Amino acid sequence: MHWGMEMNVEQAIEYVKKNNVKFIRFQFVDILGFPKNVAYPVKAGEKGIEELREIFENGVWFDGSSITGFVGIEESDMLLKPDLSTLSVLPWRPEEKSVARVICDVYKDEKTPFEGDPRSRLKAILEELKKEMNGEYFVGPEPEFFLLKRDPHNPHRWVPADDGGYFDVEPLDDAPDIRRDIVLALENLGFHVEASHHEVAPGQHEVDFKFDNALKTADSVITFKMTIKNIAKKHGLKATFMPKPFFGMNGNGMHCHQSVWFNGEPSFYDPEGPYNGLSETCLSYIAGILSHAKALVAITNPTVNSYKRLVPGYEAPVNIAWANKNRSAIIRVPAARGKATRIEFRAPDPTCNPYLAFACMLAAGLDGIKKKMTAPEPVERNIFKMSEEEKKQLGIESVPANLAAALDELECDEVLQKALGKHIYENYMEIKRAEWDDFRTAVTDWETGKYLIY
């Protein structure tokens, strides 16, 4: 039985017994998407099984006051309710007396979901989509990452672990065995891995997994990052999903392929539609994403460093336009049609909280559908080579140049604020404004190197 399969309490207990599980991690994420957990030992005998049954049925209490973006000390008691379909043994932990994890929803009490829990927020939006429009939202992300080794000349510095480039093989690509171990670990966790390969920059890699409903995919992104970091550590390396770890190299993106289905049918395809079969629904969804793009990147590209990637060049998706094959636009529509018709939003990076990013992308696209927005004409020329005047004539704007500007846009976007909910929005803004202030007031090595001469 693998993660993703429905499981009742008795089946979960049998899974624990069969896999000789000694510890269970009850896992959730904070407002920034960092995984948190509390581990419970599985005790022997019938008494231990009864304790486990009670925990699986009722959840575990914890102090939420120390979790970023959650609650104050005066309301700290919170409850983790496990989603047993996510119960899975962690393949990088010892096989003997193994460790399993289960992803949880955060509750304020036995019956009330916590409005600051990112996973619960995405679930609520997906339930609303199902109830109001009989809709489903599917996402297929492509998170890129670097594998790093310590610089032999400076052990405090990390450098790319190989000199390979796009699709390279040995000896330029030193990491096929590591990617093999990553793929095997992901498959043990229930992932449907489609491909793995070296990316453009030295030390940069991509492992692609099959799309799924947005909730499972968000869970998958968190699990994916944990898996890669732990497998890299076993090989003496460090994995990073930092958007732009090195000047002069491509950064790490997380392009998000996505589609919405209504009444069990794909809604983005119309054999009679323009652009080789795109439906009005698809074009309105595109228009919605484009109209909210400036604010959306505050969520999908949430760090100061994110905007070192979002600069012209290095294939960075900064231009608010859409296209069919043209990768210089922020939205691309892959060639596949029929059930595979989808759009690719190219701005996101892997530092985003996937629960919040998916919730906001969906809200932006649905706003376009509900308001019957009209998408502009696709731009099939290389936008990177256009002059500012050419872009102005075509109405092509750029995403904000930094995190502060993106947060300013989010402050003006009521649709995305509603998608986040009051608690998450207010806490997120407070955290990110403070992050920007930390950066704004920091004195960097570049500055001292440039200005000490004065």
Swiss-Prot record:
NCBIfam families from the UniProt entry: GlnA
Record field: catalytic activity: L-glutamate + NH4(+) + ATP = L-glutamine + ADP + phosphate + H(+)
Cofactor(s), by name: Mg(2+)
Natural source organism: Methanocaldococcus jannaschii (strain ATCC 43067 / DSM 2661 / JAL-1 / JCM 10045 / NBRC 100440)
EC numbers for this chain: 6.3.1.2
Binding site for ATP: 194, 257-259, 327, 332, 339
One of the record's GO molecular function terms: glutamine synthetase activity
Enzymatic class: ligase
Positions that bind Mg(2+) 2: 144, 199, 206
Protein's recorded name: Glutamine synthetase
Purpose: Probably involved in nitrogen metabolism via ammonium assimilation. Catalyzes the ATP-dependent biosynthesis of glutamine from glutamate and ammonia. Beta-glutamate is a much poorer substrate than alpha-glutamate.
CC per GO annotation: cytoplasm
Reported regulation of activity: Feedback inhibited by glycine and alanine, and inhibited by low concentrations of methionine sulfoximine.
Domain of life where this protein originates: Archaea
Compartmental location: Cytoplasm
Membrane-spanning ranges: none
Positions with a binding annotation for Mg(2+) 1: 142, 255, 344
CC cofactor note: Binds 2 Mg(2+) ions per subunit.
Domain (GS beta-grasp): residue spans on this chain: 19-111
Pfam families associated with the record: Gln-synt_C, Gln-synt_N
PROSITE patterns with a match to the protein in the record: GLNA_1 (PS00180), GLNA_ATP (PS00181), GS_BETA_GRASP (PS51986), GS_CATALYTIC (PS51987)
